[in-house]
């Protein structure tokens, strides 16, 4: 059974409220879960203590059992100091597109020609 620590959405339309839960990865997002580990309220200010609440002991237990946090929950765990900060590297996003690469090449050729 592949365990995930993830967010389960609650609240009403345009008023989201999330529960941090430990569940089987095959279950629906808001479906059955094994344990509620905390809450996340994105509507509160970022510096509010009530924005993210977690039961640290239970989160550590599930991590020791092999549960994998989702990306957003992993960021919460990094902020709480429960997990090492993952290096996020997307080198393909920094590579210019075809058109910009052609323009840069032409600009370099013009600069080389004017330097001669």
Swiss-Prot record:
One of its GO terms (cellular component) is small ribosomal subunit. GO terms for biological process: translation. The keyword ATP-binding does not apply. Pfam families: Ribosomal_S16. InterPro entries: Ribosomal_bS16, Ribosomal_bS16_dom_sf. Signal peptide: none annotated. One of its GO terms (molecular function) is structural constituent of ribosome. Residues 99-110 have a biased composition (Basic and acidic residues). Residues 88-116 are annotated as: Disordered. The keyword Ribonucleoprotein applies. Keywords: Ribonucleoprotein, Ribosomal protein. PANTHER family: 30S RIBOSOMAL PROTEIN S16, SMALL RIBOSOMAL SUBUNIT PROTEIN BS16M. HAMAP family: Ribosomal_bS16 (MF_00385). Belongs to the bacterial ribosomal protein bS16 family. This is Small ribosomal subunit protein bS16. The lineage of its organism: Bacteria, Pseudomonadati, Pseudomonadota, Alphaproteobacteria, Rhodobacterales. The gene is rpsP.
């Amino acid at each position: 059974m592949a365990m995930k620590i993830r967010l389960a959405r609650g609240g009403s339309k345009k008023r989201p409220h999330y529960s941090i839960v430990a569940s089987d990865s095959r279950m629906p997002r808001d479906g059955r879960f094994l344990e509620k580990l905390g809450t996340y309220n994105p509507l509160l200010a970022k510096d509010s203590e009530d924005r993210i609440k977690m039961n640290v002991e239970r989160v550590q237990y599930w991590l020791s059992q092999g549960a994998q946090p989702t990306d957003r929950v992993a960021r919460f765990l990094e902020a709480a100091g429960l997990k090492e900060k993952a290096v996020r590297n997307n080198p393909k996003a920094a590579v210019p597109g075809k058109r910009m690469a052609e323009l840069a090449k032409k600009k370099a050729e013009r600069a080389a020609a004017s330097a001669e």
